[in-house]
Amino acid sequence: MATTKVEKVLNWGVAYTPEMDKGGQRPQPRWDTLRDQVREATDLGYDTAVAVETQHDPFLALAVAAQEPSPIELSTGIALAFTKSPVATAYVAWDLHTMSGGRLVLGLGSQVKGHVTRRFGMPWSKPAQRMKDYVGAMRACWHSWQSGEPLNFKSEHYNLSLMTPNFAPPPIAKPHIPVLIAAVQERMLQVAGEVCDGVRLHGIVTRRYLDEIAFPNLQKGFEKSGRPQAEWKNFEISGGGFLCVAPDRDALARAVEKMKSTIAFYGST
């Protein structure tokens, strides 16, 4: 039977709005509020605290959040994958998983070509195959660190063969780090089903998209993974859909109008 998890997005900064261009200083992030937010999320019954990657590094936010004793998961939702080496991501994920007592859920996404090449100056290649190789490279590192076996991973995008003891973290009590990837198109959905523990769907989805695109391709990938079909119930499907909440009808109408522009933006990219 499927279970439902509720996520709380951590807010340690002030989101950019076009009005900020009219003058005035943009507020600095409030890192000191993160532990309070985790405590509040725990008290309110949330299952996961999520850090997104926009203006600030989500791994730093989770490092702070992990200092608050809590049973809830800590997740990146999402962190950009192609802007860094999979080995670098493997290191920070391993440390955060250890620091949090095994509570990390690693959410990754490819971003679009323009951001990867123009904002970060990194190369772009076939995103679905590259993401599959990226996840495989991370898991190869984690396996090497946990087992002590030599690192040996070869793929189209990444070849790893050096991990001396001086650079290998020690084994940990809970070595499995759940990996979710953001996916929209068929091939990336299949990669999520094949090599990941779950998927993060885009907010701009419809019931028809779920039934005709998302679910069939996730299942197709899952079947390729060789995992027993009984484990499909543990595959996490996160996100999907936009929700407007307001204290009265007038405020709700304004929120809906603002949401229309958000949907138009995503629909045009």
PLM feature segments, named:
Residues 12-17, 52, 75-77, 107-109, ...:
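A cross-family glycoside hydrolase active-site/sugar-binding cleft signature
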Residues 49-60, 81-87, 206-210, 244-246:
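Acidic-and-aromatic substrate-binding clefts and catalytic sites of carbohydrate-active enzymes
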Residues 61-79, 83, 134, 223-224:
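Alpha-helix-loop-beta-strand connector modules within alpha/beta enzyme cores
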Residues 252-269:
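Active-site pocket-lining/capping segments in soluble small-molecule metabolic enzymes
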Residues 238-251:
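Short, conserved secondary-structure transition motifs
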Residues 2-7, 20-22, 90-93, 97-198, ...:
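Internal, glycine-rich beta/alpha segment that forms the wall or movable "lid"
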Residues 47, 197-200:
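Receiver (REC) domain switch/active-site residues of two-component response regulators
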Residues 1-74, 177:
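N-terminal beta1-alpha1-beta2 module of alpha/beta enzyme domains
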